[in-house]
A protein has these predicted regions:
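Conserved catalytic-core segment of NTP-binding enzymes
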Residues: 1, 51-54, 60, 84-100, ...
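Conserved beta-strand scaffold positions in the cores of enzyme catalytic domains, especially
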Residues: 14, 69, 180-182
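Short aromatic/hydrophobic-glycine micro-motifs
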Residues: 42, 66, 177-178
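P-loop NTPase switch/communication element
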Residues: 45, 54-81
Length: 203
């Protein structure tokens, strides 16, 4: 039996990680962002908001330094292929649970792609302007254009397979006008940390 969620509102800024497909580098990128923000001294909470139940994804955020982790399974969903209204109610419940962990910042992953039937679009609508930084993990530069054009908000940064080479980064910029970064390369970590601090307005 699910315990009722506390009557709290989540006000912390959110880093939202979306992807063009199921295995596009979201969890690896999320782990890095959790680690960077934790090293800056912030209380980081990790969450997986949509997708299919693979708890190891979100548990790896704990290994990276998150003080707590949450998953849609915590509100009784084995996957988020669900009625959008029911999912919305449960997601709001999940956000109240996340708020109870008193995060300075939330690193949230929307599993699969927002165009797949996992309610990614509903999740983005519910989160609204709490999302201060949107990372799109893409398998290839052409996929960036498809997903980026499907939403009102443009990603702040592109990562994943599309950005693992200089040629890929340049092609992302040429096709979409977006900035891409190879997060596997350690020399990208400081620029990413600076970008996060700026967008999240964390002090």
């Amino acid at each position: 039996v699910l315990q009722p969620a506390p009557a709290l509102e989540l006000t912390a800024p959110i880093v939202l990680i979306t992807g063009t497909s199921m295995s596009s580098g979201k969890t690896m990128s999320g782990r890095l962002i959790v680690r960077l923000l934790s090293q800056m001294g912030f209380n980081v909470v990790g969450a997986k908001l949509t997708g299919a139940a693979r708890y190891r994804d979100v548990l790896s955020y704990e290994d990276a330094g998150a003080s707590a982790v949450f998953d849609f399974v915590d509100v009784g969903l084995p996957s988020t292929v669900a009625d959008p209204e029911d999912f919305k109610t449960r997601l709001e419940d999940l956000l109240r649970r996340i708020a109870s962990a008193k995060p300075d910042v939330v690193v949230a992953e929307a599993g699969a792609s927002p165009l797949e039937p996992y309610n990614g679009k509903t999740a983005i609508d519910v989160l609204g302007d709490r999302v201060r930084f949107n990372l799109l993990c893409a398998s290839d530069p052409y996929a960036v254009v498809g997903v980026a054009s499907a939403f009102n908000r443009q990603p702040d940064l592109v990562a994943g397979g599309a950005a693992n080479t200089t040629a890929g980064i340049e092609l992302v910029r040429k096709l979409s006008g977006l900035t891409a970064m190879n997060l596997i390369a350690s020399d990208s970590h400081q620029p990413l940390a600076d970008l996060l601090k700026d967008k999240l307005q964390l002090r």
